[in-house]
């Protein structure tokens, strides 16, 4: 389909997704957190203030790799009061890989916070062995306040369905097959996001600049969503057209 040629593959642009300011508002920076964590888990210092603690079968090398990725993508920025920056926890075991972030009280209830940290997880997953991973938001007592799966399914031709939140690999695989059957996926390397959260199911298509202003393209995406919807669990589905920086340019609910 022509809209694939106009876009469809995103880059490593989570800061352009509007996450920079949001991250600063919700991460917990405290020397007390470091003291608590240091009594329980080994850690790797990134820069002079930020730290990755690791447990289970995760290694020091894993923690260093994750820390480097978080720094490269702007999450770790060597800032914070009292000489302490941000803390992140990496765990590996029989249940897979989990990355946990300490966040300010109540921040997990803010709009788009789930998407914000899922995108961070998507960016750094290759540094800890790849998909899938679990992303958790914790309070200062280490209680899990929010948890999301971040995974991907790659189809023939390098088209990718990312599945987020409560969405599963089998749902992403089924959606990918449906998108192929309905000629959306054509082996040109398109990216689609399937998200399931408390507010329902969202299907996001990465498109080229201006595609969201073209009525014919929009109608095409509406049709594809209705056709592929059963593979994602059925309608209604929130349809979103996003640019290659994952900024939502058009959204509607498809019934």
Regions found by a protein language model. Give the residues of each.
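Hydrophobic membrane-insertion alpha-helices, especially the h-region
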Residues: 18-33
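N-terminal presequence-like segments and adjacent domain-start helices
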Residues: 32-66, 151-173
